[in-house]
Amino acid sequence: MEDSATKHIIQMTGFKMEEKEALVKLLLKLDCTFIKSEKYKNCTHLIAERLCKSEKFLAACAAGKWVLTKDYIIHSAKSGRWLDETTYEWGYKIEKDSHYSPQMQSAPKRWREELKRTGAPGAFHRWKVVLLVRADKRSDSLVRVLEAGKANVILPKNSPSGITHVIASNARISAEREQENFKAPFYPIQYLGDFLLEKEIQNDEHSQISPAWTKYNNQEKGNDVGFPEMKGAGENMYRTQNKMENHNKNVSDRFVLSEHHKKKFKDFRKDIRSVKKRNTLRRHGLENQKETKKKDKNIQRSYILRKKNKKEGYCKTDDAHDTIRSMLKKRGHYREQKEMKNPLLTDGTKESKTKDVKTNMNLIEIKNALKKQIYKDIYRAQAVRYNCIRVDKQPVYNVEVKNSEFPRGILNLIENLIEGQFFKEAIEELSSLQAHYIPPVCLLHAILENVLQDKIDTFSGRYFHILSALLHLHPPWKSPAMLKYYLELFQCPTCMKGAWDFTEVLIRSCLFNEDFCHQISENISTKVVNLTLLKFFFNLLEGEVRHLSQKLCDWSDSQSLKVTEKAILHEIFWSGSETSGLLTKPVNMLLEWTIYSHKEKCKSNDVFKHELSYLLTGILGAAVDYWIFLGIQMGRNVIRHMSDDLGSYISLSCDDFSSKELEIFICSFSSSWLQMFVAEAIFKKLCLQGPTSTCTEPLSLQKIIDSYLPILGKMDIHGAGKMQSPKKLCQRPCLESQRALLMLNGAKRKQAEGRPELLELNRAKCSSSLKKLKKKSEELSCSKENCPSLVTKMNFHKTNLKGETALHRVCIKNQVEKLIILLSLPGIDINVKDNAGWTPLHEACNYGNTECVQEILQRCPEVDLLTQVDGVTPLHDALSNGHVEIGKLLLQRGGPELLQQRNSKGELPLDYVLSPKDKEELFAITNIDDTVDNFHAKTQKHFYHQQLEFGSFLLSRMLINFCSIFDLSSEFILAFKGLGHLNELLMACNSDTEASNAHTDWLLDVYARNIKTLKKLPSVLKELPENLNVCPGVHTEALLVTLKMMCQSITELS
């Protein structure tokens, strides 16, 4: 591979003759060598018109060359020098709607970075290839591609042993296989293109680095150790999206019964039911299964994953059930199997026997056994979820560390290598000793400091492999000493201010482009290094949560387990103190960054922003899950804490999200708890008005079925009208979270008084001004070059206390000249928002400044006409204040979609127009072949369906995640049928003997309510609101399918 400092040698592919000649003329302005040839030569940069499988394109990928777009030449020629290639490389950005796969889009970048990282000479450097192709132009082209990738191409007659690939046409492959001339595998000709552009890169280079890496890779066998390599951003983004989609799919399908599942239940009841009754139930179950498969194939498909992970857990559940039965039998309340209708207690127990139970039964012993089983169910469900997220198994730490202290001689050697900037040799020495010694923090910090200064760009990937192997071999939960080691390691090597400060600096540098805590290189690769460090941090925290979940799942005595060891999560987010409060300062900051990163992700297709958003949501999910696991173990009612604190906080912070953005945001959480409580908080804000008894109760299955489901059924009648209280006429609404700030700043809006008079006044004013507007605009455009002092005086990035920029202020004051000058400045953002969320276009529409609106629409094609605050768009602002002419301008640009937008009170823009004539004129601009009334009726119906769909999505998230978290599957129903009756006895005992500690049994109460709700679910389904059955939405249908599957499980077991 060529060094980036050498002279540029350029080749082109895929261009038509005219375009190619134009690019060649631009190359004459730059210092380079252009090779005009149809064959691939040893170039340094290939300029490709499009993604393809041409000889040059494949050869450049195989050789790890820069494969760039034509913009690289155009922009470099304008600058008079060669620019940095990174942002012009094919694979820098992945297009979602492209007909090319993400692997093909990212192939040039992936291969270049992989070969640069490993030091391999080419993609085929270990291949010994025999080509069985007719000698023609095509075979010559194949040879050039193979030789570019450093393959050893051998003639068929001189074929020695050790051939790795035989490439031939399909017909030749069959003939040669019959003759058995070659023992190597055969491949078709198109395999080369598929290997380079469509296949994942197989990382077999690590064995060349050092003996330690050989051992390490043999243990892993290609699995992800827990820390992704620094591959192309496109590949990372594709993997990120697949993780999210697979996670959401697995979580969404918890109630589908597989053959293995049903067999477990039938075997469990074999000693209770007679053979005749068992066969009857089996036939009934098979019939239901056929019907279920016919209707819901997609939902049933992913439940197979769950049965594999829970197979071992079922055996433990059976043992726990036997323990509970033995306790009951010991007390004389275990009936004969022929008389039993359920495994634990009979629901129809007489009142006289209830008194005997209260007198004779050891309630404390049974209560503890039940709580122990409930804990196991919860922790097993969480362990299964984490195993589904990451396919690699929990590592076994069987590597023996001879001595935690490095030999002094080796330590001095590596220090001298680093000081002499022999980084490759220093990293190789560390790698070779890593299996037997823990690398000293000082050495890792010394290398990291040079990585941050961009001095080790070529070998930075190997450094992160050392960190990855360190986490695999010596995790922080291995011992308290290792925890201290990681806390010392994960901090800035220069400032040494601690792990949280380092995490904050990394996030801010990636999210806001803020300066590092000390002076570092400003190269673009430094930002990638910061993101890679965040990946390591994320894998570190996720590993801790997985370890805690597995430990709690394996624990056998619920009364004796005490999680005493600390964790990095504990030290960073709760400063090592008591975790009674969830929302500490670090957690609050992480919440704000996560929400902000999601907003930025929704605005662009930048792979870097998407990857950063994924990491932040993952870190937040790990922190929340850790806090919840510890809280449940300590008997804390985490449901009430989460619902009151976290869910409400996030729902307020996401006030300006659209329903689609909220769906994506909720599904992006890896934590089922986060999904559930954020969905509930948004549902309450959307559908409930004011504080009610329903709002104050913690989330439960009973609350979802008895309270939220009927409310959802009435949404087609009430819509979203309950979201906020009515406001005064024409007064702008504002976010509740911003209202206090606006009152403090004295923000007042210009309001219309006496609407009919104002309409006539504005119409007369606008009609006269519009005639002169074009001429005046042209004059101002010509004179703006003569006003440099005006530009100097205006700092368009500066904001006042209300968050208003110079754009906001000139639109409020109708200063058209200054507006034109500002819009001509580079980097100006016409969609910038103040503290309340208003844009400059909002201000111009609200104040009736028609000329400003005209200039914005004319000069800013990127202006967002659908931007809103509590649903108030610029069109709402204009028409609510009587500015009809501005409304016409907006509709000419935005079309009928603007008329379909509703504010928080459910009002459409035309609802503000009282004059029928004005309303007809505004409606006519959209060229809709319909009447205003019919259009509004259709819009109303569509709006209610959207609201119902979004409500169904939120309710589905609550229901599926709640049942997943508390493991409300069929075996639970079978084993704990009598829990409701038993819990009444326990609560009665608690009221007498443990009144002060009644809150510690909140889990028993939750499970008792769950069973009670599940038993009446079939009757609830028969009385579902009609609109839920007729709504065609996907989320509504998914909600109904989930409820029906739950109901079917209960019916089969009754």
Swiss-Prot record:
InterPro entries: Ankyrin_rpt, Ankyrin_rpt-contain_sf, BRCT_dom, BRCT_dom_sf, BRCT_SLF1, Slf1. CDD domains: BRCT_SLF1. GO terms for cellular component: centrosome; cytoplasm; nuclear inclusion body; nucleoplasm; nucleosome; nucleus; site of double-strand break. Residues 2-80, 121-199 form the BRCT domain. Residues 284-299 have a biased composition (Basic and acidic residues). Keywords: ANK repeat, Cytoplasm, Cytoskeleton, DNA damage, DNA repair, Nucleus, Repeat. GO terms for molecular function: protein-containing complex binding; ubiquitin protein ligase binding. ANK repeats lie at residues 802-832, 836-865, 870-900. Widely expressed. Expressed in testis. Expressed in spermatocytes. GO terms for biological process: DNA damage response; DNA repair; positive regulation of double-strand break repair; positive regulation of maintenance of mitotic sister chromatid cohesion; positive regulation of protein-containing complex assembly; protein localization to site of double-strand break. It is found in: Nucleus; Cytoplasm; Cytoplasm, Cytoskeleton, Microtubule organizing center, Centrosome. The keyword Cytoplasm applies. Disruption phenotype: Mice develop normally, display no pathological abnormalities and are fertile. Residues 407-1054 are annotated as: NSE5-like domain. Residues 283-303 are annotated as: Disordered. SMART domains: ANK (SM00248), BRCT (SM00292). PANTHER family: SMC5-SMC6 COMPLEX LOCALIZATION FACTOR PROTEIN 1. BRCT domains are necessary for its targeting to ionizing radiation-induced nuclear foci. Interacts (via BRCT domains) with RAD18 (via C-terminus and phosphorylated form); this interaction is required for efficient repair of UV-induced DNA damage. Interacts (via N-terminus) with SLF2; this interaction links RAD18 to the SMC5-SMC6 complex. Interacts (via BRCT domains) with RAD18; this interaction occurs in a SLF2-independent manner. Interacts with SMC6. Plays a role in the DNA damage response (DDR) pathway by regulating postreplication repair of UV-damaged DNA and genomic stability maintenance. The SLF1-SLF2 complex acts to link RAD18 with the SMC5-SMC6 complex at replication-coupled interstrand cross-links (ICL) and DNA double-strand breaks (DSBs) sites on chromatin during DNA repair in response to stalled replication forks. Promotes the recruitment of SLF2 and the SMC5-SMC6 complex to DNA lesions. This is SMC5-SMC6 complex localization factor protein 1. It comes from Mus musculus. The lineage of its organism: Eukaryota, Metazoa, Chordata, Craniata, Vertebrata. The gene is Slf1.
